[in-house]
């Protein structure tokens, strides 16, 4: 069985194509969204999702989140004395989703179509694929998030040619894509984005407003108090979309700090973020050679697009109401599930050709002559420019720059800077050329880039026909099949908590967190209910556990209100 997975910065989802069409698969807690949070305790137990999120309130050093931002890098996260790479943490999310899907579907899940941001470069895509492999999933196909959203909205079934812009503002990343449908082909025309802009930034604005109004300083708060502040700011951010003002409260020791924040104040403080949002929109339109008026439809995906401050801004910007038929949190996962069905050649799904673009420019280092006989080295020569539809193959002819030069070195680079040193080095190829006066020998440098992110570099000496090729599959941190297998064995000691224990652990963690926040009689009441629940867990009698859990849940919900 092939499933579709939206591996998000803030939340992740799994979906499958069933007889009823694409459906979101609920996790073991019965919810569609699984927070992309992982916690590992000192005994090697892994907690994923809400349970890990609750542990962050109590054991912040054992929890990692937003690690999608570091995919494809060498960064490691230290959880309870154990080090993990971003793809290893992502694999734990994927394992969790895989288990839930198998229980829901009643069959083994062997493969997944995983969504990635359109601007993810080769390193990040390879890291995502490795995460799937570490989770025991075959990942042959990845789909860009905007394309997945367009598929979910059914735009590929439209009868007429259409241009549309997909606006994806998630918890931690921002992505703008312009797509065009013509003759049953869904083509990505341009992408732009910001890897460090998302709903979390709008939460930070709310947090800063609260600190300003209460005279508090973030650095003076303990780590647990900072976590509580963020949680309260997140709740206020969501609440203010439906109100003209919200009241934030934060218990610090025995003092309850309170501040009222109006919608007008919040909108004014968000102005800088909205201006940052505008830039990728302008860039994507410019790269596609289009104006705002050329866009037929605007689609919203990502949970942060629910914010009224964001939606109002977009209505003013595009002078039209965006399409909001689908749940913005679920559209990408549903599209990935439809793509999985296409891969399986399911007859219920109309086949459509999905094209993607090269997110970053690929080129090489060259020497340029800026005056007669004066040269400057270290310059960047683009060969396949960003937002070129892939698969693509382009050739540049380059010449020798010195008399009696007998070798040409082709350094393969990725980036947008004029200077080679500022771009990402991918590989290098050297080839012999006949000696002669400078400029007398030429080489054809051909880059071929396919939809699976494989880059083939071919260098051909024009005079002799000598040809050399190299294929760039990944970067220095690419793992071999043997290394992946070895790491899977090393990670096998980490056990995701059994499904039937998840709800009990989550309730207990919530209760412990609220106990720490409470005072006086409220704290005593919580202690009494927690003790009863813990006693029921020790006895192991299902009916007693359910009764005690329900009673504890009731007072926890009263506290949350």
Regions found by a protein language model. Give the residues of each.
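Oxyanion-binding/catalytic loops of NTP- or PPi-dependent enzymes
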Residues: 1-73, 77-83, 92, 99-561
């Amino acid at each position: 069985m092939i499933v579709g997975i939206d591996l998000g910065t803030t939340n992740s989802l799994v979906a499958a194509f069933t007889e009823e069409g694409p459906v979101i698969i609920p996790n073991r807690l019965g919810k569609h969204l699984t927070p992309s949070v992982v916690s590992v305790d000192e005994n090697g137990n892994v907690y994923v999702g809400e349970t890990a999120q609750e542990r962050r309130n109590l054991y912040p050093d054992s929890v990692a989140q937003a690690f999608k931002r570091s995919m494809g890098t060498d960064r490691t996260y230290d959880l309870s004395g154990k080090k993990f790479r971003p793809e290893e943490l992502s694999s734990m999310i994927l394992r969790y989703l895989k288990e839930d899907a198998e229980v829901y579907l009643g069959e083994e899940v062997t493969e997944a179509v995983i969504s990635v941001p359109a601007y993810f470069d080769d390193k990040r895509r390879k890291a995502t694929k490795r995460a799937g492999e570490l989770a025991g999933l075959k990942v042959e196909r990845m789909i860009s998030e905007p394309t997945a959203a367009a598929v979910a909205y059914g735009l590929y079934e439209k009868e007429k040619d259409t241009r549309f812009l997909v606006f994806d503002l998630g918890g931690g990343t921002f992505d703008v894509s312009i797509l065009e449908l013509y003759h049953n082909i869904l083509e990505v025309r341009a992408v732009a984005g910001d890897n460090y802009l998302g709903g979390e930034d709008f939460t930070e604005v709310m947090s800063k407003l609260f600190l300003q109004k209460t005279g508090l300083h973030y650095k003076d708060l303990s780590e647990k108090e900072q976590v509580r502040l963020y949680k309260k700011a997140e709740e206020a951010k969501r609440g203010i979309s439906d109100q003209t003002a919200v009241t934030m409260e934060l218990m610090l020791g025995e003092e309850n700090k309170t501040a009222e924040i109006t919608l007008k104040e919040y909108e004014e403080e968000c102005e800088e973020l909205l201006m940052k949002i505008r830039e990728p929109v302008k860039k994507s339109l410019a790269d596609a050679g289009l104006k705002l008026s050329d866009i037929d439809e605007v689609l919203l995906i990502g949970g942060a697009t629910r914010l009224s401050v964001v939606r109002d801004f977009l209505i003013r910007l595009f002078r039209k109401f965006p399409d909001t038929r689908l749940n913005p949190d679920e559209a990408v996962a549903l599209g990935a599930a439809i793509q999985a069905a296409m891969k399986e050649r399911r007859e219920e799904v109309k086949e459509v050709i999905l094209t993607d673009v090269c997110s970053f420019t690929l080129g090489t280092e060259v020497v340029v002559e800026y005056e007669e006989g004066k040269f400057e080295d270290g310059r960047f020569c683009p060969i396949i420019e960003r937002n070129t539809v892939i698969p693509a193959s382009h050739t540049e002819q380059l010449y020798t720059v010195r008399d009696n030069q007998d070798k040409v070195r082709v350094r393969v680079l990725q980036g947008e800077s004029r200077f080679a040193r500022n771009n990402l080095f991918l590989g290098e190829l050297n080839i012999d050329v006949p000696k002669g006066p400078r400029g007398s020998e030429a080489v054809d440098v051909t880059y071929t880039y396919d939809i699976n992110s494989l880059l083939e570099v071919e260098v051909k000496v024009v005079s002799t026909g000598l040809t050399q090729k190299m294929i760039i599959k990944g970067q220095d941190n690419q793992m071999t099949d043997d290394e992946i297998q070895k790491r899977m064995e090393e990670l096998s000691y980490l056990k995701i908590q059994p499904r039937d224990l998840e709800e009990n652990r989550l309730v207990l963690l919530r209760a412990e967190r609220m106990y720490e926040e409470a005072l006086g009689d409220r704290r005593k009441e919580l202690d009494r209910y927690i003790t009863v629940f813990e006693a029921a867990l020790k006895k192991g009698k299902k009916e007693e556990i359910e009764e005690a859990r329900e009673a504890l849940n009731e007072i926890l919900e009263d506290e949350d209100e």
